Every structure is written in structure tokens, then in C-alpha cells.
């Protein structure tokens, strides 16, 4: 089964840094010597918990150029620093940081366990496209998707599943993003559209053999079909 995934970060992820032109027409790097690096997560500014990019922008603008205390996570260690926002010609205050607070995509559901209503998907974690760091999530949505195309994998080139997650139904919630996959709970089983009467036993590691592999997929909400 193919499903859509929307992840919301715990704090905001720093995905880049750039110089800022201030009102004085000079170039500034307010992030310099703060210890903040790409891949870090900003979780608090002064006494405000940061949960989105918009909240960070608003909080920085409220500083009016005064020094602010930033709490961030660097390689699983919580750190703090002082940083002074730079006023731009448009009267905005900026830190010179590019940040992101969410990610989305489609992927295969690995399993659904009826007795606990839990699911696993992807078989690998979701990393940020810019930093390649595993995204530390605060919450997530598990939603239906419309599959548009499946590209078979070839030697040296992995296969791809393309789909859209716009205007789709909620299936459940995502609680964990790990290097082994995405995990969560199914709240709306009818939206997942699976036949729970046909359970399949998961093979043990020592039972797996090299050979042809197939996926079961529903294209355009039709009955599941098998694809090599």
C-alpha cells in the first residue's frame, strides 16, 4: 500500500546560512561564531518555544535588533548562544539562517498490525534534502495518496513511486522517524483501504533469499495489483 507522509519538525531545522545586507549597506553574518551549523535544530528564542518558521520570523522581528538567546540542538546536544539580528532595508530583522519546519512525500507501507493499530513505512528514515540529516519530528500525518507512476528499479538506479498528497484523507498519525523507517498509529482504517482478513507473515532475516521481488499497489484506487 502506498501512503502520503507529512512530518512537522521539533523546532526548526537550519538548512543553510547566508550573508545579509543591512540598512548600512554592509554585508553581515550574525550567525558567525555562535556555534550554529547546518543540520542543527532551533527550539527556543529567549522565552519563546519555536515550533515553526513563521514563529521564528515573528520572534526575531520582535527583538528590534537587540541580542537574543537562542537554544538549539547540535548532534543531540542542547546548546545556547547569543545572536544579534541585523536590520535590513525593508525594516525586517534577520539572522542569516535558512530554516525548514516540515517535510512531505509518499512511500510504501511496510506493515499494519491490527491488534495495536500500529504501522511502519518506508524501511528507512526521512532525511532533510539539504542537510541529509535525519529529521527530528514533533508530529506527523499519515494520509491517503493518489499514485501517478511507478518506475522499476535498475542496476545502480533505485525504483521510484510518484504520487500526490493534495486534498487527501487522514489515515493516522506519525510518532517516530528512525533510520529503520516511519512509525505511528492508524486511526481511520477504512481510508487505508486494506484487506485485514489476508494477513501475511513477516519473514525472518535468515529466511530472506535473493531473487525477484514484487510490490502490491493500488493505482488510481483500483484493486491491488502485483508489480515486479
Residue ranges and their predicted role:
Residues 14, 31, 39-42, 70, ...:
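Terminal peptide-recognition signature
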Residues 1-13, 54, 65-67:
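N-terminal targeting leaders that route proteins to membranes or the secretory/organellar pathways
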Residues 47-48, 73, 218:
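Short, surface-exposed secondary-structure boundary micro-motifs
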Residues 31-54:
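Conserved PDZ fold ligand-binding element
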Residues 86-228:
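Serine endopeptidase catalytic core focused on the charge-relay Asp
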Residues 3, 37, 57-96:
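PDZ-domain C-terminal substructure recognizer with occasional recognition of PDZ-binding tails
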Residues 4-37:
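PDZ/PDZ-like groove recognition
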Residues 48-59, 80, 224-226:
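Short, Lys/Arg- and Gly-enriched loop/turn segments at beta-strand edges
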